A protein has these predicted regions:
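Short Pro/Gly-enriched beta-strand edge/turn motifs at strand-loop
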Residues: 31-36, 224-226
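Helix-loop element at the rim of GNAT/NAT acetyltransferase active sites that forms part
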Residues: 17-31
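C-terminal "cap" of GNAT-fold acetyltransferases
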Residues: 236-249
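Catalytic micro-motifs at enzyme active sites that drive phosphoryl/nucleotidyl and oxygen chemistry
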Residues: 36-42, 67-69, 102-107, 228-229
Length: 256
């Protein structure tokens, strides 16, 4: 099942899943509070909607679920954080603005309603096309309900050495660069060049194999990518800017 979290308890379960994936499985460095609570939490959680994929056939096996008199709950196996422009504007802006200069893109598209996608993760055994399709179906329903014109966000490649990621970064730079008016540039202090290999040195097939499933999914749907990558040392990742105007979404994905 895919739906929005409706209670604080469900948001906490999404935060626990994020902690498991980002901190325990990958190499993110938790703050003391995150390590204590075993949840990935930040100020944006309070102003975002949280999309959940729930497996009703599986139940939580955490100590919390085995307390006397507490009902066993279906397992949250995937999540996405959704931030609408009106919520961002009335609080502290988009999370992405901490890595990319998105103001020129916003100015080039006056009146467009933007939705930021972030903090996406899926529990390891569920990293299948089916789960990605469920998340996409949930996002697409949300986009239609709120009349969103374009989606934006940061997508991550694992690792903090851009030279080891030269092939996928160069592929995105040469073959999937956002058009003028939709292309955000990494902030000057954080800018890492993506064109580490010449266009003719990029083997597209090998590059696609080196990309994480989420970025491959974005490419399939019709997303394009910004100018420059950003190294996020806390999360142990190299981030790229992704943008997807609704008008650019491949027709076959609109029918979900």
């Amino acid at each position: 099942e895919v739906r929005l979290a409706t209670t604080k308890s469900e948001i906490r379960r999404a935060q626990r899943l994020r902690y498991r994936v980002f901190y325990e499985e990958m190499s993110a460095v938790p703050t003391g509070m995150a390590a204590l609570k075993r949840r990935d939490v930040d100020a944006y959680d309070a102003i975002c909607d949280h999309l959940l994929v729930i497996d009703h056939a599986a139940v939580n096996t955490t100590p919390f679920a085995t307390k006397p008199f507490r009902r066993a709950r279906p397992k949250v196996v995937g999540t996405y954080r959704l931030l609408r422009q009106e919520a961002a504007d009335s609080h502290f802006g988009f999370y992405t603005a901490g890595e990319y200069d998105i103001a020129p893109m916003m100015a080039a598209n006056p009146g467009a309603r933007f939705l930021e996608l972030g903090r996406s993760c899926v529990l390891k055994p569920y990293r299948t096309k089916r789960t990605v399709e469920l998340l996409w179906a949930g996002i697409w329903a949300y986009v239609q309900h709120h009349r969103i014109d374009a989606m934006l966000g940061c997508a991550s490649l694992e690792g903090t050495d851009p030279d080891r990621l030269a092939l996928p970064l160069s592929f995105l730079h040469h073959h999937a660069r956002a058009a003028e008016g939709w292309c955000a540039r990494a902030l000057p202090k954080r800018y890492v060049a993506m064109d580490r290999l010449a266009r003719e040195a990029v083997d597209p097939k090998a590059a696609l194999q080196a990309l994480p499933p989420l970025i491959k999914g974005y490419l399939r749907v019709g997303a394009t990518f910004g100018d420059g990558a950003v190294v996020d040392h806390q999360f142990g990742t190299t981030d790229v800017f992704v943008v997807l105007p609704v008008s650019a979404i491949a027709e076959r994905y609109r029918d979900h």
